[in-house]
A protein has these predicted regions:
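Helix-start (N-cap) detector for alpha-helical repeat units in TPR-like alpha-solenoids
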Residues: 35, 42-43, 76-77, 110-111, ...
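Alpha-helical adaptor scaffolds
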Residues: 88, 100-147
Length: 221
């Protein structure tokens, strides 16, 4: 006997279709009804998206973050992660949109503000707005973090404020090294500053020296 799949949602429509087919005169085929439901929660879709993202499968990660947002449009982490996917794909306008939506959910949030700043840096658009936002984030509670200060330094450099950019980079470098030293001595339970963050800070300071040689710090005696 032949069968065919009729994928309908919700289940009431599927049942109605089945009754119509069964009552139709001369119908000898009984279709198999499959009612598709999404068993995953929004949080589970985000977890799946993160797993895909770590494997470099950005399209699949984007799909899962989109599914999470269809279930919960106010899911902050899904918004930021989706913005990160667009940023990685160099779709800066779309990334900016997602970060702004995330900031509507959490005004002044450091992560969303930081990533929105990088959308501005990479695209070259909205540097002034991003700089104002990051100045506010860094001056707020818990704002003195190496990664945030590094981003602030890059924004200042792009806005042609080399002296202020060097101040941000120098403070980011100092805090990063202090965290590493404290962790080694067992003084702090916080994780040490990753080496990649130190490398990024030094790379950005190198870019600053190339762009603005006069902004280079004076050599130590």
């Amino acid at each position: 006997m032949m069968s065919e799949e009729v994928r309908l949602r919700p289940w009431r429509r599927a049942l109605q279709t089945l009754l119509v087919l069964l009552l139709a005169g001369g119908c000898s085929r009984i279709p198999r009804i499959i009612v598709l439901e999404d068993p995953l929660t929004a949080a589970e879709h985000v977890e799946l998206g993160v797993a895909y993202e770590r494997k470099g499968e950005l399209d699949l990660a984007q799909r899962e973050y989109g599914r999470a947002l269809r279930k919960d449009a106010k899911f902050y982490r899904a918004r930021v992660n989706l913005g990160n996917i667009f940023l990685a794909k160099k779709e800066y306008g779309k990334a900016r949109k997602e970060y702004l939506l995330a900031l509507e959910l959490r005004p002044g949030d450091a992560d969303a503000s930081n990533n929105l700043s990088w959308a501005a840096i990479f695209s070259g658009e909205g540097i002034g707005e991003a700089l104002t936002r990051m100045e506010s984030v860094v001056s707020g509670p818990n704002g003195r973090q190496p990664t945030l200060l590094d981003t602030l330094g890059v924004l200042r450099m792009r806005a042609n404020h080399p002296g202020e950019a060097e101040e941000a980079f120098a403070l980011a470098d100092a805090l990063c090294r202090q965290a590493g030293a404290a962790s080694k001595e067992g003084v702090s339970a916080a994780a040490p500053c990753p080496e990649e963050v130190l490398r990024e800070i030094e790379e950005h300071r190198g870019e600053l020296r190339r762009r603005f040689p006069s902004a280079s710090p004076a050599p130590a005696d």
